[in-house]
A protein has these predicted regions:
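Short hydrophobic alpha-helix segments
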Residues: 27-30, 81, 151
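Short glycine-rich anion-binding loops that position phosphate/pyrophosphate groups of nucleotides
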Residues: 67-70, 134-136, 241
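General beta-strand structural signal in soluble alpha/beta enzymes
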Residues: 103-107
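ATP-binding/phosphotransfer module of carbohydrate and carboxylate kinases, centering on a glycine-rich
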Residues: 1-61, 72-76, 93-101, 115-125, ...
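Glycine-rich phosphate-binding loop of actin/hexokinase-like ATP-binding domains
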Residues: 123-175
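A charged helix-plus-loop insertion that forms the helical arch/lid used to bind
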Residues: 76-87
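A short acidic/small-residue loop/turn micro-motif
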Residues: 32-34, 85-86, 155-157
Length: 292
C-alpha cells in the first residue's frame, strides 16, 4: 500500500510516496513560492503532483502536514500568517473531490512530533513534547500517539511563552541566535546562518560562544516550563540547528538541571530529532492510517 504525503512550509513543499511501514519509495521537494503564488499556487502544485503520482502508483490516501493553524475536523486552514491567501483553504474538500481518496490535514509541528514518536527519537516514549527551533519556535505534545490540540487548536504554540528574557520566539529561535551573533560581531546578518554561527563556536570564538550560552539559557527556561506543565517522558528537539547535538546537549542539560529538581526532569531526558525533514510526512502517514 502506497500513500502520498506532503509537508508544506513557507519555503518548500516536501513530498513522498510512503508504504504503510514508513518506508519511502520516492521523495523530493519543490519551492513553495509562497509570496508570489500564495495559497492557490500551493493547491495547484500539490494537485498536479498527485495526478503525476497516480500515473505510476495506485494510492491509498493523501496526508498533509502543513504550516498554519489547522481545523483537523474540516481539514482546512484556520490561519496562516506566513503564506498569503492560504487562510481558509479547504484542503480536505479539494482533495477528496479531486481524487476520491481519504485525506487528513494536520499542523506541521504536530505531524513532526508524531513522526518522531512513531519512528524517530521518541519511539521508546509514551509521551513527549517536541520543540522545533527554526525561524521561530514551535511545540507539540504527544501522548500514546495522540496530539493535544487544545480548545482552539493552538496547544503547543510556545513561541508566545514568556520567559525572563522575553517572548520565547524573540530569545530562543534560530533567528535570534544568528541575528545576535551577527550584531555582536558586526557581521552582515544576511551572510550569517546557523552553519556560520556553529563554525565560529567550534573555532573557539568567544563572542559566538557567549551568545550561544545565552540562547541555551533562554531555551532552557522554556524547556523547564514545559517539563513542569506537561511532565513528558522526554523532550525531543528538532529544527536545523539541532543537528549540532554535540555542542548543544551539554549546555542544555546543564541549564535544565539547574532549573528543576531531578524528580521533575523528563525521565528519558532530552532527545534530538532523528527523522528531521521526513518527520512531518511520517506523522501525516500515521494519522492517515489511524483514520482507516
Amino acid at each position: 500500500m502506497i500513500y502520498s504525503c506532503f509537508d508544506i512550509g513557507g519555503t518548500a513543499i516536501k513530498f513522498g510516496l510512503i508504504d504503510e511501514t514508513g518506508r519511502f519509495r520516492k521523495k523530493g521537494s519543490l519551492p513553495t513560492e509562497a509570496q508570489t503564488e500564495g495559497g492557490p499556487g500551493i493547491v495547484h502544485k500539490v494537485c498536479s503532483l498527485i495526478h503525476r503520482q497516480l500515473t505510476d502508483h495506485p494510492l491509498e490516501g493523501i496526508g498533509l502536514s502543513t504550516a498554519g493553524i489547522v481545523d483537523t475536523e474540516r481539514g482546512s486552514i484556520d490561519y496562516a500568517l506566513s503564506i498569503p491567501g492560504y487562510t481558509g483553504t479547504d484542503w480536505k474538500g479539494i482533495l477528496e473531490k479531486e481524487f476520491h481518496l481519504p485525506c487528513i490535514v494536520e499542523n506541521d509541528t504536530n505531524c513532526a512530533a508524531l513522526g518522531e514518536w512513531w519512528l524517530g527519537a521518541g519511539r521508546d516514549m509514551a509521551s513527549l513534547f517536541a520543540v522545533t527551533v527554526g525561524t521561530s519556535i514551535g511545540g507539540a505534545f504527544i501522548e500514546n500517539g495522540h496530539i493535544l490540540h487544545g480548545a482552539s487548536r493552538a496547544a503547543g504554540e510556545i513561541a508566545y511563552m514568556r520567559v525572563p528574557a522575553g517572548r520565547l520566539h524573540d530569545v530562543a529561535s534560530a533567528t535570534y541566535l544568528c541575528r545576535e551573533i551577527a550584531c555582536k560581531k558586526a557581521a552582515d546578518p544576511e551572510k550569517v546562518d546557523g552553519r556560520t554561527c556553529f563554525a565560529w563556536v567550534r573555532q573557539g570564538d568567544a563572542t559566538a560562544a557567549a551568545v550561544l550560552d545565552t540562547f541555551c539559557q533562554n531555551l532552557a527556561d522554556g524547556l523547564a516550563n514545559i517539563a513542569c506543565l506537561c511532565n513528558p517522558d522526554g523532550i525531543v528537539l528538532g529544527g536545523g540547528i539541532m543537528a549540532q547535538e554535540a555542542i548543544l546537549r551539554p549546555r542544555l542539560e546543564q541549564a535544565l538541571a539547574a532549573r528543576l529538581p531531578k524528580m521533575m526532569l523528563p525521565p528519558k531526558g532530552l532527545a534530538f530529532a532523528q527523522r528531521q525533514n521526513d518527520a512531518g510526512m511520517l506523522g501525516a502517514l500515521y494519522l492517515l492510517q489511524q483514520k482507516k
